Amino acid sequence: MKAQPLPQASQASTRRWSPRRWATGILAVVLFLMLAIQFVPYGRNHVNPPVLAEPAWDSPTTRALFVRACADCHSNQTVWPWYSSVAPVSWLVTKDVVDGRAAFNVSEWGRANNEGDDAAETVQEGEMPLWFYVPLHPQAALTPDERAQLITGLTATFGGGYND
């Protein structure tokens, strides 16, 4: 008696589990999920509340440097970039703006717990702007001279810093 050869796997079943099919399936699922999360409303309703009051800036230069490097998160005059409407990035951008406004908002000057006394120190220590902000907003990149000028102006406007 001759040994019967093992049946060959059909081409259809081999193709079903090929790496290319897996990659196509995974890509389809990822695209579907990316489309589905666009319907989550958080992060798309970009609201800039009215400006209630601003601090008495020590100079127009300090204000201009602040607007350029800080105001998107620390004022009610946020310029919302196109990617702030695409989830999940919109969720992160909205969270950063909400947190920034809650911590320090120059558009609601005089509100309780809204002093800028540590603003100069935060910039001087390199904590602000956040590490990922400048690559996405090149206009916010300050030269060393501009950074020093901003720190001096923030100290003059709000007090605080290392010179107190």
Each predicted region: which residue ranges?
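Acidic helix-start/capping segments at beta-turn-to-alpha-helix junctions
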Residues: 80-95
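The canonical Cys-X-X-Cys-His
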Residues: 66-78, 128, 150
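Electrostatic cytochrome c docking/interface patches
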Residues: 45-66
